[in-house]
């Protein structure tokens, strides 16, 4: 049977918009510094509003007036990350690092750009630098864990997630949930389903509104043969994210295995409609093929009976 299982990966980077704080001088500040700082602040404001192209325009002005403005390069890097222009993000982070080698943020963000490009080894190298500069920053361990998982080095990924858990403030429930969710994914890949379930349970307890952990726990239930648990969790995914076609497919498969044939057919029909509306032609065709196969199997079972 077609395996529609998809596990979700959550990348957490605390994008820190950096503000420049003018130092106290006995003499008036140069006009250029004031103006560049104003452009920087305008850019930061546009970032907060989600206007990333406008933010870049302001950061460009700040850099034109002050070519060694480290903060402007760092913040422009963040804007490019949001626009998924990873080449420019790497370029700006590199310039920020050249201007201030002891600043952790550009290493974290350049690592993220490399990670999203699929260049996991380069990402790991940047996170190593960040950890050397700031050994108590959980983000570097967590992101290095993600990159290790991308490389398929699951034991090292788990080790980094564990280190992140030792450094993260226990009051930050959403980042904690992400770490447990991603550690659960790695344990799932290692077929340690019991440990994966425990991590997904913790992720759900910390963030009960995140459908991804329910989806992942449902997949683990299915692999354990717990189709009732799979139906329960896929149903919760659908309650939280009504257009999640994959959840309908997987709930349909679990329902079929439980003998609820009409519910299975209804879910697959709904899934095909969502895939069609979303323009996902490959998934749409595969769902129709699966629907046809299930109907044939149901008909055959009826004839034999």
Residue ranges and their predicted role:
Residues 2-305:
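Alpha-helical tetratricopeptide repeat
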């Amino acid at each position: 049977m077609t395996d529609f299982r998809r596990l979700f990966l959550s990348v957490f980077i605390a994008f820190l918009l950096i503000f420049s704080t003018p130092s106290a001088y006995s003499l008036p500040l140069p006009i250029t510094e004031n103006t560049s700082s104003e452009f920087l602040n305008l850019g930061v404001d546009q970032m907060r509003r989600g206007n990333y192209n406008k933010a870049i325009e302001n950061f460009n002005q700040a850099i034109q007036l002050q070519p060694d403005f480290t903060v402007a390069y760092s913040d422009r890097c963040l804007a490019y990350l949001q626009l998924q222009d990873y080449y420019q993000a790497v370029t700006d982070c590199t310039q920020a690092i050249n201007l201030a080698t002891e600043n952790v943020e550009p290493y974290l963000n350049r690592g993220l750009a490399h990670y999203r490009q699929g260049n996991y080894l380069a990402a790991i190298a940047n996170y190593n630098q960040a950890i050397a500069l700031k050994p108590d920053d959980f983000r570097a361990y967590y992101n290095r864990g993600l990159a290790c998982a991308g490389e398929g080095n699951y034991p090292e990924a788990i080790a980094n997630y564990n280190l992140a858990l030792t450094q993260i403030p226990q009051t930050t429930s959403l980042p904690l949930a992400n770490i447990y969710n991603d550690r659960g994914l790695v344990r799932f890949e290692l077929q340690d389903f019991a440990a994966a379930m425990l991590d997904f349970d913790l992720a759900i307890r910390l963030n009960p509104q995140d459908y991804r952990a329910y989806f992942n726990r449902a997949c683990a239930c299915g692999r354990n043969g717990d189709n009732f648990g799979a139906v329960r969790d896929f149903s919760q995914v659908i309650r939280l994210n009504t257009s999640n076609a994959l959840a309908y497919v997987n709930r349909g498969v679990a329902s079929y295995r439980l003998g609820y044939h009409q519910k299975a057919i209804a879910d697959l029909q709904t899934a095909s409609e969502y895939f069609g509306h979303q323009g996902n032609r490959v998934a749409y065709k595969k769902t129709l093929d699966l629907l046809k196969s299930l109907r044939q199997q149901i008909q055959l079972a009826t004839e034999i009976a």
